[in-house]
Amino acid sequence: MRIGVLALQGAFIEHIRMLERLGVETFEIRNLSDLKEIPDGLILPGGESTVMSKLLQDLGLFEKLRSLIMTGTPVMGTCAGLILLAKYIEGGSPSLGTMDITAVRNAYGRQLGSFQATAPFAGAGNIQMTFIRAPMITHVGKNVKVLAEVDGVVVAAREDNQLVLSFHPELGEDTFVHQYFLEMIAGTN
């Protein structure tokens, strides 16, 4: 299994390290030539979603990534990655717009508004969640499954091959979310 991690900004190295701990081969996606071979899965990490969207266009990655996702390549978007995948952005324009959710950028405030929470994920036990200038999911489409909520707010969801998280699972020690994604790729959950 090979997972491509968008490596333009954000905590992409932490995602790579987490996957390597799980014995998964990874590669960095920095330009179109990095996608000559179709990956088994994609990770769109955190960062600044407006800048990332512009870089995707400038580097010629936008259409290729969108096409891979729309044709079924599993993708996990964390924080800014969630914003890139959201079909609707309150007060803004969507980017890739492949997942039937509505999101609000930086819903939890500035960097000082960062926090940690513990909540059940995907029907499993509690996991630690790190929120850094996190987006909020305010609406999910009829085919979207809510996987986690904190204080009644959706912070993780899945629609078919797309998994989005408001938080940063790569910044903790728990591998559960990445394992969930790998099982999603393997078709076992």
From Swiss-Prot:
Keyword Chloroplast on entry: no
Function description: Catalyzes the hydrolysis of glutamine to glutamate and ammonia as part of the biosynthesis of pyridoxal 5'-phosphate. The resulting ammonia molecule is channeled to the active site of PdxS.
GO biological process: glutamine catabolic process; pyridoxal phosphate biosynthetic process; pyridoxine metabolic process
PANTHER family: PYRIDOXAL 5'-PHOSPHATE SYNTHASE SUBUNIT SNO (PTHR31559), PYRIDOXAL 5'-PHOSPHATE SYNTHASE SUBUNIT SNO1-RELATED (PTHR31559:SF0)
Source taxonomy: Archaea, Methanobacteriati, Methanobacteriota, Stenosarchaea group, Methanomicrobia
Active site: C79, H168, E170
The protein's name: Pyridoxal 5'-phosphate synthase subunit PdxT
PROSITE patterns, per database record: PDXT_SNO_1, PDXT_SNO_2
Binding site for L-glutamine: G47, E48, S49, R105, I132, R133
One term under GO cellular component: glutaminase complex
Stored CDD domains: GATase1_PB (cd01749)
Entry-linked HAMAP family: PdxT
Enzyme Commission code(s) on record: 4.3.3.6, 3.5.1.2
Gene: pdxT
Assembly and oligomerization: In the presence of PdxS, forms a dodecamer of heterodimers. Only shows activity in the heterodimer.
Pfam families with a match to the protein in the record: SNO
GO molecular function: glutaminase activity; pyridoxal 5'-phosphate synthase (glutamine hydrolysing) activity
Taxonomic superkingdom: Archaea
The entry's keywords: Glutamine amidotransferase, Hydrolase, Lyase, Pyridoxal phosphate
Pathway(s): Cofactor biosynthesis; pyridoxal 5'-phosphate biosynthesis
Swiss-Prot/TrEMBL catalytic activity: aldehydo-D-ribose 5-phosphate + D-glyceraldehyde 3-phosphate + L-glutamine = pyridoxal 5'-phosphate + L-glutamate + phosphate + 3 H2O + H(+); L-glutamine + H2O = L-glutamate + NH4(+)
Similarity comment: family membership: Belongs to the glutaminase PdxT/SNO family.
Source organism: Methanocorpusculum labreanum (strain ATCC 43576 / DSM 4855 / Z)
